[in-house]
């Protein structure tokens, strides 16, 4: 007889009323070719907007924009201060040990400005005894190569780890170009048929190197010191649009990035209190070059853009338990951004030539050199008067530059409706603010220093449950409803002067439902099955006033935000064999504020399927793994962004080796 077990463990005080999604380590370490953009696409309800394979990928929660998503790495915010967003294609999933999503109001516990939510990324000590090593080699379609190496050492006090990922590919996949038509003629040159040509992705090559160094020291007396340093060297061509004409040899379209992120940490833990201090530094150098052959065989630079970002970071946090029912937390953080951006548009004029005989009379040079300090402080009180009931009050204050936002309050409550099945009801309410980014204010041309801060109220309620039967199965799930009214939403729109400029929309109403479920079962001693699914309904409607008589955006869904999204993944294991299937779906997205259903005004819905087969071998001297993956299993033709081609069916193969040196991992 299988005995049913009631699960009602004492939940962490920090999680009272919080809507959070945590990713399993199996998901994060699926294969070395994946970025966090891939992880979020197939394992969460948030929307990932990708400009192509190995190109810019941003995420947005609950019908908000990418700049409404805050991202932290080991406690330090890593959103680009110029753009306000994060490129998740540049974050290897093998560099992340712990990842979670804080939805909506829950993000206020970590940072302000996350009108949609917050992505929390971190690394953790490996708990290694002695020396350890892991090497993985991957090879895939389009001459793609992926390599991963990790070296580890650990003892009673020290944990040291070095990880490196190198990825490269010509990235010249084939696709059907629906933006062009080829004609078939008869003998009299009459058009008798037309077809969409098969083309290759042009100017899409990339070479990315990531190195992560970690050092941890644990005194064994309640103190732990840590150093995390992550270096990125990226060289990526920017693929031509499906509408671009001309020969590939006539263009060079390239983006380069060098970024160093580093965090020093100290954690001091006692029985009923804890103090943490962190200091960090981020340096980013970005370069964009667009060159074109003018017909004389010399590649002339048309656009040359250089940006440097230096960020200094400090944070201090404290926790104090008055009792097992009452917790006080407080924290303060500072980010000092120094940004230098220089753009040159090099125009040609025959009346004034340089040494190559190319004109420079009408060169256009625009730049800005700005600094801004961002301060944030918070205090929270979490109270659990009885085991079933928990309440949390959070107050947060923020200053950007010399401007203070009004106090950001948030209130959370949860209540266990039934111990049987651990059925819990949650509710929360918060006010939130987001300051304009540096590009919003100062970018030339188009920056708007007169922008207002975005502000709004968010309401949320939901249910969750979890059941278990003695090592046989676990079943858990949650459903939540949210309603968010945002004033002065910032959006970049075209102007009559020929460039884009940000403006404030008077009011946006984002609301909807999120559902998530997980199921794991041990069929017998050898067979195991795990299932995970998510669904989101996220209308995001412009409810402001028309800006002109021709404005057709009022009452319409905001651009590039799907109303529906869903994911499903299943993992079946038999001894050392593993089979993984992943599926995701995004509904129709509009490219215009008017929601015009024209050829270029909307992107059709699409679904994606990937499948992976894996086999592990345990030898006397090493553990080996072989893994094969099929991406886009059904060869779906789709677009995530207008005129940005995406790959069809493609394949990857990985071989991994972990030598058995010294003691095994605990």
Regions from the PLM with identified roles:
Residues 216-234, 255-404, 419, 477-481, ...:
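Face-selective signature of the C-terminal outer-membrane beta-barrel domain
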Residues 37-80:
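Extracytoplasmic beta-strand/coil segments of soluble accessory domains associated
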Residues 153-253:
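Periplasmic-side early beta-strands and strand-to-turn transitions of outer-membrane beta-barrels
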């Amino acid at each position: 007889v299988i005995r049913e077990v009631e699960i009602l463990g004492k939940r962490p005080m920090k999680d009272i009323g919080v809507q959070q999604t945590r990713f399993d380590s199996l998901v994060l370490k699926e294969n070395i070719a994946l970025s966090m953009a891939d992880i979020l696409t197939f394992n969460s309800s948030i929307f990932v907007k990708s400009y192509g394979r190995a190109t810019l990928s941003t995420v947005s929660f609950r019908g908000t924009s990418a700049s409404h998503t805050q991202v932290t790495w080991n406690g330090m915010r890593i959103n680009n201060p110029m753009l306000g967003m994060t490129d998740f294609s540049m974050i290897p999933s093998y560099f992340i040990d712990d990842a979670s999503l804080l939805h909506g109001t829950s993000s206020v516990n970590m940072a302000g400005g996350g009108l949609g939510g917050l992505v929390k990324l971190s690394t953790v000590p490996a708990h290694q005894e002695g020396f350890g090593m892991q090497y993985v080699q991957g090879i895939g379609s389009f001459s793609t190569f992926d390599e991963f190496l990790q070296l580890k050492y650990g003892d009673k006090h020290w944990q040291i780890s070095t990880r490196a990922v190198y990825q490269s590919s010509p990235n010249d996949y084939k696709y059907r170009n629906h933006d062009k038509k080829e004609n078939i003629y008869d003998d009299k040159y009459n058009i008798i048929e037309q077809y969409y040509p098969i083309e290759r992705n042009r100017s899409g090559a990339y070479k990315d190197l990531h190195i992560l160094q970690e050092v941890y020291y644990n005194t064994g007396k309640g103190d732990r010191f840590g150093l995390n340093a992550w270096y990125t060297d990226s060289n990526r061509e920017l693929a031509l649009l499906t509408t671009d004409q001309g020969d590939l040899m006539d263009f060079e379209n390239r983006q380069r990035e060098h970024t160093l992120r580093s965090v020093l940490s100290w954690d001091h833990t006692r029985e009923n209190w804890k103090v943490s201090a962190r200091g960090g530094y981020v340096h980013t150098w970005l370069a964009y070059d667009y060159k074109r052959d003018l017909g004389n065989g010399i590649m002339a630079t048309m656009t040359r853009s250089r940006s440097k970002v230096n960020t200094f970071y400090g944070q201090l946090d404290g926790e104090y338990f008055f009792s097992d029912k009452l917790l006080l937390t407080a924290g303060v953080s500072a980010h000092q951004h120094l940004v230098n951006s220089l753009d040159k548009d090099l125009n040609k004029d025959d009346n004034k030539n340089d040494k190559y005989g190319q004109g420079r009379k009408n060169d256009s040079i625009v730049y800005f050199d700005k600094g801004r300090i961002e301060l944030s402080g918070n205090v929270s009180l979490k109270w659990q008067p009885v085991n079933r009931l928990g309440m949390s009050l959070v107050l947060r204050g923020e200053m950007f530059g010399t401007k203070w936002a009004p106090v950001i309050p948030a209130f959370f409550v949860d209540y266990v409706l039934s111990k049987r099945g651990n059925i819990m009801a949650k509710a929360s309410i918060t006010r939130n603010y987001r300051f304009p980014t540096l590009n919003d204010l100062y970018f030339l041309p188009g920056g708007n220093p007169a922008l207002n801060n975005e502000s709004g109220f968010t309401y949320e309620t939901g249910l969750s449950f979890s059941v278990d039967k003695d090592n046989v199965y676990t079943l858990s799930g949650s459903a939540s409803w949210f309603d968010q009214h945002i004033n002065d939403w910032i959006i970049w729109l075209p102007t009559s002067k020929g460039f884009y400029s940000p403006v404030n929309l008077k009011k946006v109403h984002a609301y909807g439902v999120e559902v998530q479920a997980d199921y794991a079962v041990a069929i017998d001693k050898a067979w195991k099955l795990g299932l995970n699914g998510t669904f989101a309904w996220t209308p995001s409607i412009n409810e402001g006033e028309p800006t002109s008589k021709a404005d057709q955006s009022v009452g319409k869904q905001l651009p590039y935000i799907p109303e529906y999204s869903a994911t499903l993944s299943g993992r079946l294991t038999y001894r050392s064999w593993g089979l993984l299937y992943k599926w995701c779906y995004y509904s129709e997205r509009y490219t215009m504020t008017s929601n015009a259903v024209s050829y270029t005004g909307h992107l059709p819905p699409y679904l994606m399927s990937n499948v992976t087969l894996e086999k592990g071998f345990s030898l006397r001297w090493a553990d080996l793994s072989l893994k094969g993956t099929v991406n886009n299993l059904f060869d779906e033709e789709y677009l995530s962004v207008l005129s940005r081609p995406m790959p069809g069916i493609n394949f990857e193969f990985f071989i991994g080796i972990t030598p058995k040196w010294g003691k095994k991992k605990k």
